[in-house]
Swiss-Prot record:
Keyword Secreted: no
Gene Ontology molecular function, alphabetical: DNA-binding transcription factor activity; transcription cis-regulatory region binding
Stated name of the protein: HTH-type transcriptional regulator BetI
Task performed by this protein: Repressor involved in the biosynthesis of the osmoprotectant glycine betaine. It represses transcription of the choline transporter BetT and the genes of BetAB involved in the synthesis of glycine betaine.
Organism: Escherichia coli O127:H6 (strain E2348/69 / EPEC)
Keyword Transcription regulation on entry: yes
UniProt signal peptide: none
One Pfam family per UniProt: TetR_C_6
Keywords: DNA-binding, Repressor, Transcription, Transcription regulation
Gene3D superfamilies associated with the record: Tetracycline Repressor, domain 2
All residue ranges annotated as the HTH tetR-type domain in the record: 8-68
Transmembrane segments: none
Pathway stated in the Swiss-Prot or TrEMBL entry: Amine and polyamine biosynthesis; betaine biosynthesis via choline pathway [regulation]
Coiled-coil positions: none
Length: 195
C-alpha cells in the first residue's frame, strides 16, 4: 500500500527533475530515463503518475502556469484597494517573479511555447495563460480608461512583458529586473491619465 501523501511528493520530484532536464539538455533531448534518474525513481513511476513523457510535460507546464497565477494573485491580493497603476505593477511583478525567470523556468517556457504549436493540450494551456495576462491587464487599465484604450494599453503592456522576458530568455543572462520594472512602469504611466 502506498504511503499517504506520497503521490504529491513523487509528482513534485518528477516535475522538478523535468525542469532540471529541460534546463540542461532541452525538452526534446530530455528522456524519461534521464528524468527518472534525476528524481531517483524508476521509469515506471513516471508512467504510473503521468502516462508518458507528454503527460509529464503537460503537468510541468501546468505547474509553471500555476506558479505564475499564484505570483500574480498574491501580489494583487496584497493591494485590494490599490490604484490601477500599483495593481498593474503587481501584475508585472508576478510575471517577473523568480519562479518565472529562473534559467530552468525560462527554458521550459520557451520549449512549451515552441511545442504548443504542435500539441493541442500545450497550445490550450499556453492560450489560457496568455488570455489571463491580457484580461488582468485590460481589467486594471479599464478602471481608468475607456474600453478601446484599455484593450490597446493591455495588449501593449502584455507585449512589453513578453518581449522583455523573451529577450532575457534568449540572451542566456538573467532578466534585468530593475530595467524591466522601469520600462513597464514608464509604459503604464504613459497610458494612464494624469491627476
Amino acid at each position: 500500500m502506498p504511503k499517504l501523501g506520497m503521490q504529491s511528493i513523487r509528482r513534485r520530484q518528477l516535475i522538478d527533475a523535468t525542469l532540471e532536464a529541460i534546463n540542461e539538455v532541452g525538452m526534446h533531448d530530455a528522456t524519461i530515463a534521464q528524468i527518472a534518474r534525476r528524481a531517483g525513481v524508476s521509469t515506471g513511476i513516471i508512467s504510473h503518475y503521468f502516462r508518458d513523457k507528454n503527460g509529464l510535460l503537460e503537468a510541468t507546464m501546468r505547474d509553471i502556469t500555476s506558479q505564475l497565477r499564484d505570483a500574480v494573485l498574491n501580489r494583487l491580493h496584497a493591494l485590494p484597494q490599490g490604484s490601477a497603476e500599483r495593481r498593474l505593477q503587481a501584475i508585472v511583478g508576478g510575471n517577473f517573479d523568480e519562479t518565472q525567470v529562473s534559467s530552468a523556468a525560462m527554458k521550459a517556457w520557451l520549449a512549451f511555447w515552441a511545442s504548443s504549436m504542435h500539441q493541442p493540450m500545450l497550445y490550450r494551456l499556453q492560450q489560457v495563460s496568455s488570455r489571463r495576462l491580457l484580461s488582468n491587464l485590460v481589467s486594471e487599465f479599464r478602471r481608468e480608461l475607456p474600453r478601446q484604450q484599455a484593450q490597446e494599453a493591455g495588449y501593449g503592456l502584455a507585449a512589453l512583458i513578453d518581449g522583455l522576458w523573451l529577450r532575457a530568455a534568449l540572451s542566456g543572462k538573467p532578466l534585468d529586473k530593475p530595467l524591466a520594472h522601469s520600462l513597464t512602469r514608464h509604459f503604464i504611466t504613459q497610458h494612464l491619465p494624469t491627476d
